[in-house]
Regions:
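Vicinal oxygen chelate
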Residues: 13-15, 70-112, 120
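Conserved short beta-strand elements that form part of the metal-binding/catalytic scaffold
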Residues: 28-65, 112-118
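Short catalytic micro-motifs in class I SAM-dependent methyltransferases
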Residues: 6, 25, 114
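Amphipathic alpha-helical segments
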Residues: 13-29
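Residue-level marker for the onset of beta-strands and adjacent loop->beta junctions
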Residues: 5, 39-41, 68, 99-101
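N-terminal beta-strand motif that seeds the catalytic metal site of vicinal oxygen chelate
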Residues: 1-18, 67-70, 119
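Generic alpha-helical hydrophobic packing signal
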Residues: 22, 29, 45-47, 53, ...
Length: 120
């Protein structure tokens, strides 16, 4: 049995969050809807493998996402860093004790993002 993964972020910052993930990870809109009481977007990676999706859902409450991190494995972390605009706040890359290299970002909602190379 095959699975894919979809993670949902509910936020009052729908447009800003959608634009952030499209800009940083070159994601594409897989689905988008906008009705009076239901608004959101599902983003996918451009490669079309459909193994992971990110749903950004419009909500009135700004949630506390402390303790949550979204982790993206990069084939070449140095090349990824070079694609980032200078205004993107970041920390690293940092070598971790197990040999992987981590770059730390934070999305508009305070969700911790780790982009890493090496390991699983």
């Amino acid at each position: 049995m095959a699975f894919s993964l979809k993670t949902k972020i509910t936020t009052p910052r729908l447009a800003e969050t959608r634009d952030y993930y499209i800009r940083i990870f070159d994601m594409v809109v897989a689905e988008e809807w906008n009705s009076p009481d239901d608004k959101g977007v599902i983003l996918a990676f451009r490669d079309g493998k459909n193994e992971a999706f990110l749903e950004i859902y419009d909500g009135e409450t700004a949630y506390d996402f402390s303790g949550l991190s979204l982790q993206f494995k990069a084939e070449n972390l140095t090349a990824f860093v070079e694609t980032l605009d200078p205004d993107v706040e970041r920390r690293g890359p940092v070598e971790r004790p197990w040999g992987s290299h981590y770059l730390y970002l934070t999305d508009p909602n305070g969700v911790a993002i780790i982009v890493y190379e090496g390991g699983l």
